[in-house]
Amino acid sequence: MNKIVVLGAGMVGRAIAIDLAKKHNVVSADICEESLKKLEAIENIKTIKSDLSNKKIVKKIIKDSDLVVNAAPGFMGFETLKTIIESGKDVVDIAFFPEDVLQLDDLAKKHKVTAIMDCGVAPGMSNAILGYHNTKMIVEDFEFYVGGLPQIRTLPFQYKAPFSPIDVIEEYIRPARFVENGKTVIKPALSDTELIEFENVGTLEAFNTDGLRSLIKTMKITNMKEKTLRYPGYIDQIKLLKDYGFFQTKEIEIDGKQIRPIDLTSKLLISKWKLEDDEPEFTIMKIIISGIENDKKVKYIYELFDKFDTKTQTSSMARTTGYACTSAVELVLNGNYTEKGLFPPEFVGAKNDCLKKMLAYQKDRNIIYKVSRKEN
């Protein structure tokens, strides 16, 4: 059995550890005792309470591992990934940090490491699917819509998060990049709001976020965009908080103490946005790829609708993100993907039967991507 270290035991990190423990010996490391306790009784999982912001501690934990999963919070994700690579360990990453991860490619090559980044549901599977089709056709347009939402809508936000609010807020303050007529366009996050109908849910609200990430640099496609999905009305609440400075990252003084408004906001929202372990929720995604295939105008549509798993008590967002990650872990361990360097999922999807294997792996866990093809 391989030894795999999962750094981070949040809702997604736990799902990853539990899934991998079916075949491997797993070490789960986190500073939160409450999160680690939920893993203690599971066979093949060892828990370690540790400060993952400490480089020396991380190096010690992963020293004798065969592969590492970086599921640390986004604010420490880049430095954690860098430490893993410097330690010469293969890694699959879902930290989704704001830094440009592609700058670590040379470092990964130097240490002869296979590093797969951003390998969740989106970014992640959305990238892998595009990467695959980009080898089979001339892609002209790529767009996708994605969101994770609670089944029970509670005002004012009608939203719950499986991860830290500060990571969610980061999506709302980071400028959104997309491609229009072959040129990169930058707009504020939360812009270009539109209402879209979905079969299983009804009307949802879509808005710009910076979800294309590596695709901006790696894919030469005329038009590309990504939008986040929420219940209608959510965007107005978020814009109000943003306009009044609640997401401000510059410190302000209150009674002689310096604080960042974003930290206070995140702390206050934890109780309101906390997704309970048994709370019903769903993940929804629609990917549209249009272009020329065998001299014909074609359109591929991938649709995902996944719900909270009542049998395993696992959230849909943890499942769809976590099992995308573990499917990539198996690709590396089984020798299906052996390239050395740092690779976004679009490169993985373009390789051999990697996308097919990732989809099959997730289908075994009842995560099903419905695919349709239309000729114009």
PLM feature spans:
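Conserved Rossmann-fold cofactor-binding substructure of NAD(P)-dependent oxidoreductases
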Residues: 52-64
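Helix N-cap at the beta1-alpha1 junction of Rossmann-like dinucleotide-binding domains, i.e.
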Residues: 32-35, 98
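Conserved N-terminal Rossmann-fold NAD(P)-binding element of oxidoreductases
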Residues: 4-8
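C-terminal catalytic/substrate-binding lobe primarily of soluble NAD(P)-dependent oxidoreductases
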Residues: 135-376
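N-terminal Rossmann-fold NAD(P) dinucleotide-binding loop
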Residues: 13-14
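Beta-loop-alpha module in the N-terminal Rossmann-like domain of NAD(P)-dependent dehydrogenases
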Residues: 67-84, 97-101
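Rossmann-fold NAD(P)-binding glycine/threonine-rich loop
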Residues: 94-117
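Rossmann-fold cofactor-recognition segment
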Residues: 43-54
